[in-house]
Protein backbone atom coordinates (compact mmCIF):
# COMPACT_ATOMS: atom_id res chain seq x y z
CA UNK A 1 0.00 0.00 0.00
CA UNK A 2 1.97 2.84 -1.27
CA UNK A 3 1.11 6.27 0.07
CA UNK A 4 -1.35 5.01 2.75
CA UNK A 5 -0.48 5.38 6.39
CA UNK A 6 -0.82 1.89 7.87
CA UNK A 7 -1.29 3.17 11.39
CA UNK A 8 -4.66 4.73 10.43
CA UNK A 9 -5.93 1.77 8.41
CA UNK A 10 -6.22 -0.68 11.31
CA UNK A 11 -8.13 1.58 13.76
CA UNK A 12 -11.60 0.71 15.02
CA UNK A 13 -14.36 3.31 15.30
CA UNK A 14 -14.66 4.99 18.67
CA UNK A 15 -18.05 3.39 19.35
CA UNK A 16 -16.56 -0.10 19.11
CA UNK A 17 -13.77 0.57 21.61
CA UNK A 18 -14.76 -0.62 25.12
CA UNK A 19 -14.85 2.05 27.80
CA UNK A 20 -12.94 1.71 31.01
CA UNK A 21 -14.83 -0.10 33.72
CA UNK A 22 -14.21 2.54 36.40
CA UNK A 23 -17.27 3.26 38.55
CA UNK A 24 -18.94 6.63 38.01
CA UNK A 25 -18.33 9.20 40.68
CA UNK A 26 -21.30 9.61 43.00
CA UNK A 27 -23.08 12.93 42.47
CA UNK A 28 -24.63 14.80 45.35
CA UNK A 29 -27.78 16.80 44.78
CA UNK A 30 -28.83 19.32 47.37
CA UNK A 31 -32.53 19.96 47.79
CA UNK A 32 -33.65 23.32 49.08
CA UNK A 33 -35.32 23.26 52.47
CA UNK A 34 -39.13 23.08 52.47
CA UNK A 35 -39.42 26.62 53.88
CA UNK A 36 -37.50 28.14 50.94
CA UNK A 37 -39.54 26.17 48.40
CA UNK A 38 -42.82 27.30 49.96
CA UNK A 39 -41.82 30.95 49.95
CA UNK A 40 -40.65 30.70 46.32
CA UNK A 41 -43.94 29.06 45.34
CA UNK A 42 -45.97 31.74 47.16
CA UNK A 43 -43.97 34.47 45.44
CA UNK A 44 -44.56 32.88 42.05
CA UNK A 45 -48.29 32.57 42.78
CA UNK A 46 -48.42 36.27 43.75
CA UNK A 47 -46.76 37.27 40.47
CA UNK A 48 -49.25 35.19 38.47
CA UNK A 49 -52.21 36.65 40.38
CA UNK A 50 -51.04 40.23 39.83
CA UNK A 51 -50.47 39.60 36.13
CA UNK A 52 -53.87 37.96 35.68
CA UNK A 53 -55.67 40.80 37.46
CA UNK A 54 -54.11 43.52 35.31
CA UNK A 55 -54.57 41.56 32.07
CA UNK A 56 -58.19 40.80 32.96
CA UNK A 57 -59.09 44.46 33.38
CA UNK A 58 -57.31 45.35 30.13
CA UNK A 59 -59.23 42.63 28.28
CA UNK A 60 -62.49 43.83 29.82
CA UNK A 61 -62.00 47.36 28.49
CA UNK A 62 -61.23 46.05 24.99
CA UNK A 63 -64.27 43.79 25.19
CA UNK A 64 -66.50 46.70 26.25
CA UNK A 65 -65.14 48.80 23.40
CA UNK A 66 -65.95 46.11 20.83
CA UNK A 67 -69.39 45.56 22.34
CA UNK A 68 -70.19 49.27 22.04
CA UNK A 69 -68.95 49.35 18.44
CA UNK A 70 -71.07 46.28 17.65
CA UNK A 71 -74.21 47.91 19.05
CA UNK A 72 -73.62 51.00 16.92
CA UNK A 73 -73.23 48.93 13.74
CA UNK A 74 -76.06 46.47 14.42
CA UNK A 75 -78.66 48.22 12.25
CA UNK A 76 -76.30 48.49 9.29
CA UNK A 77 -75.15 44.89 9.70
CA UNK A 78 -78.76 43.64 9.79
CA UNK A 79 -79.52 45.59 6.62
CA UNK A 80 -76.41 44.14 4.92
CA UNK A 81 -77.36 40.61 5.95
CA UNK A 82 -80.86 40.94 4.49
CA UNK A 83 -79.57 42.47 1.25
CA UNK A 84 -76.96 39.76 0.82
CA UNK A 85 -79.57 37.06 1.35
CA UNK A 86 -81.79 38.55 -1.35
CA UNK A 87 -78.83 39.07 -3.67
CA UNK A 88 -77.70 35.47 -3.29
CA UNK A 89 -81.19 34.31 -4.26
CA UNK A 90 -81.22 36.72 -7.22
CA UNK A 91 -77.78 35.56 -8.39
CA UNK A 92 -79.08 32.01 -8.64
CA UNK A 93 -81.95 33.03 -10.92
CA UNK A 94 -80.73 36.14 -12.78
CA UNK A 95 -80.76 34.52 -16.22
CA UNK A 96 -84.06 32.74 -15.59
CA UNK A 97 -85.73 35.95 -14.35
CA UNK A 98 -84.28 37.91 -17.28
CA UNK A 99 -82.46 40.47 -15.13
CA UNK A 100 -79.05 39.45 -16.45
CA UNK A 101 -79.35 38.39 -20.12
CA UNK A 102 -76.64 37.23 -22.49
CA UNK A 103 -74.96 40.08 -24.24
CA UNK A 104 -74.95 42.15 -21.05
CA UNK A 105 -73.77 39.44 -18.67
CA UNK A 106 -70.60 38.67 -20.64
CA UNK A 107 -68.34 39.57 -17.68
CA UNK A 108 -70.89 38.43 -15.10
CA UNK A 109 -73.92 39.81 -13.34
CA UNK A 110 -71.80 41.34 -10.58
CA UNK A 111 -70.17 43.69 -13.11
CA UNK A 112 -73.50 44.35 -14.80
CA UNK A 113 -74.98 45.34 -11.43
CA UNK A 114 -72.30 48.02 -11.10
CA UNK A 115 -73.16 49.49 -14.51
CA UNK A 116 -76.96 49.34 -14.43
CA UNK A 117 -79.72 48.36 -12.02
CA UNK A 118 -79.96 44.60 -11.47
CA UNK A 119 -82.61 43.71 -8.87
CA UNK A 120 -81.19 42.80 -5.44
CA UNK A 121 -77.56 42.66 -6.59
CA UNK A 122 -77.13 46.42 -7.12
CA UNK A 123 -78.79 47.10 -3.75
CA UNK A 124 -76.48 44.59 -2.06
CA UNK A 125 -73.39 46.25 -3.56
CA UNK A 126 -74.54 49.72 -2.50
CA UNK A 127 -75.27 48.64 1.08
CA UNK A 128 -72.00 46.71 1.30
CA UNK A 129 -70.04 49.86 0.51
CA UNK A 130 -72.16 52.14 2.72
CA UNK A 131 -70.08 53.88 5.38
CA UNK A 132 -66.75 52.89 3.84
CA UNK A 133 -64.22 54.80 1.79
CA UNK A 134 -64.46 54.55 -1.99
CA UNK A 135 -61.87 51.81 -2.54
CA UNK A 136 -62.09 50.09 0.87
CA UNK A 137 -65.19 48.15 -0.13
CA UNK A 138 -64.60 44.43 -0.78
CA UNK A 139 -66.57 44.27 -4.03
CA UNK A 140 -65.19 47.61 -5.20
CA UNK A 141 -61.46 46.88 -5.27
CA UNK A 142 -60.92 47.05 -9.03
CA UNK A 143 -63.95 49.08 -9.96
CA UNK A 144 -64.50 52.83 -9.92
CA UNK A 145 -68.11 53.82 -9.36
From Swiss-Prot:
Q: Which InterPro entries match?
A: PSAN, PSAN_sf
Q: Where is the signal peptide?
A: none
Where does the protein principally reside? Answer: plastid
Per the record, membrane topology reads: Peripheral membrane protein
The cellular location(s) given in this protein's UniProt record come to: Plastid, Chloroplast thylakoid membrane
Q: Which Pfam families does the record match to this protein?
A: PsaN
UniProt keywords (A-Z) are: Chloroplast, Membrane, Photosynthesis, Photosystem I, Plastid, Thylakoid, Transit peptide
Q: Which residues form a coiled coil?
A: none
**GO CC terms in record:** chloroplast photosystem I
What GO biological process terms does the UniProt entry carry, in alphabetical order?
A: photosynthesis
Query: What stretch of residues directs this protein to its organelle as a transit peptide?
Result: 1-60
Quote the function comment for this protein.
May function in mediating the binding of the antenna complexes to the PSI reaction center and core antenna.
Give the family this protein belongs to, as stated in its UniProt record: Belongs to the psaN family.
Query: What protein am I looking at?
Result: Photosystem I reaction center subunit N, chloroplastic
- Taxonomic placement: Eukaryota, Viridiplantae, Streptophyta, Embryophyta, Tracheophyta
